[in-house]
């Protein structure tokens, strides 16, 4: 959340938040998740949007089916068209942050409501039930998500074992590949 607020502010816009969980984490990983009641998440979204109507929405970690359903209900109420879903589903340690019931709701309901979904490779693997080892696999996974109702998919390729980062953008009209040098950091 803090990084998103800083990014939006640096780009000259105003960020508003609706917290879905309090996480105990640092730059190396997530230790625990303290959930916010789904009804309070719904209220946060609707009340915040009554004050200043957002031009766009970015959705991050949705850790349970009840939370996802409350976000879907809020989206149905506020009717914003520019929605980015960054499906935070796996901690850096590899631990799943979301249960299977929630994954199914995300795959079958939520991705149809967003304009862009931005999974990394482990998240794309969970959403598509395939193993991703190459750029072709990333494109294949994006096409699976298209077939599930996603409109635009940006698969982040930083988890591939390579000296460069290769991301792919796919929609019904085009496939774009972005390749850059990988910057290795401690975190």
Regions found by a protein language model. Give the residues of each.
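Gly/Ser/Thr-rich beta-alpha loop segments that engage phosphate groups in nucleotides
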Residues: 1-2, 62, 96, 159-160
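Conserved N-terminal subdomain of the carbohydrate kinase-like
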Residues: 3-85, 89-92
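Structural motif
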Residues: 13-16, 56, 82-83, 96, ...
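Short glycine-/acidic-enriched loop or helix-start segments at secondary-structure transitions
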Residues: 68-69, 94-95, 128, 164-165
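Glycine-rich, charge-decorated loop segments at or immediately adjacent to ligand/cofactor-binding or catalytic sites
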Residues: 91-101
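Conserved phosphate/ATP/ADP-binding segment of small-molecule kinases
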Residues: 100-174
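Short glycine/threonine-rich catalytic loop with a Thr-x-Gly-x-Asp
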Residues: 182-187
């Amino acid at each position: 959340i803090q990084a998103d607020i800083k990014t939006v502010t640096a780009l000259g816009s105003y960020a508003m938040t609706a917290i879905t969980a309090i996480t105990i984490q640092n730059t190396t990983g997530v230790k625990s998740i303290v959930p916010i009641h789904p009804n309070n998440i719904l209220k946060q979204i609707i009340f915040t949007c009554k004050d200043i109507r957002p031009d766009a929405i970015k959705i991050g970690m949705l850790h349970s089916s009840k939370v996802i359903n409350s976000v879907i209900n809020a989206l149905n109420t506020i009717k914003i068209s520019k929605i980015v879903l960054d499906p935070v589903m796996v901690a850096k340690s590899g631990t799943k942050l979301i249960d299977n019931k929630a994954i199914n709701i995300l795959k079958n309901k939520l991705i149809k409501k967003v304009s862009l979904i931005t999974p990394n490779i482990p998240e794309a693997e969970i959403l598509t039930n395939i193993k991703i080892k190459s750029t072709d696999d990333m494109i294949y996974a994006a096409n699976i998500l298209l077939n599930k109702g996603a409109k635009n998919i940006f698969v982040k390729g930083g988890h591939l074992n390579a000296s460069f980062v290769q991301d792919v953008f796919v929609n019904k009209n085009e496939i774009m590949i972005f390749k850059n040098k990988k910057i290795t950091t401690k975190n």
